[in-house]
């Protein structure tokens, strides 16, 4: 799977995976919306519903092209959870410092 950087990477039937924080979704590319060329149409791989996604949203760094790769998705989720753990550790440190300063 590679980051979607250019709309030209999309070919009919190709897989596109959305990954953001702890959310992910897998789509199959269909075509440009017939009435609005600022939207692209996809089939949701799990529900089989047609989904329309705005072009600029596709290029924001949260979409990847290629066959669905469970290992890749799980590594991205691990990165997210590591960031969350660091954030919570920093909050704990800040709270402890404030408590020390009060005493």
Task: Give the location of each predicted region.
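SH3/SH3-like beta-barrel fold
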Residues: 40-44
């Amino acid at each position: 799977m590679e980051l979607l950087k250019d709309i030209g990477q999309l070919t009919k039937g190709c897989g596109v995976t959305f990954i953001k924080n702890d959310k992910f979704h897998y789509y199959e590319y269909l075509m440009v919306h017939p009435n609005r060329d600022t939207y692209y149409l996809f089939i949701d791989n799990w529900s089989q519903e047609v989904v329309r996604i705005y072009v600029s949203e596709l290029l924001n760094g949260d979409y990847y092209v290629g066959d669905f790769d469970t290992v890749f998705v799980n590594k991205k989720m691990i990165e997210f959870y590591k960031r969350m753990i660091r954030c919570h550790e920093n909050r704990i440190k800040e709270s402890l410092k404030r408590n020390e300063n009060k005493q």
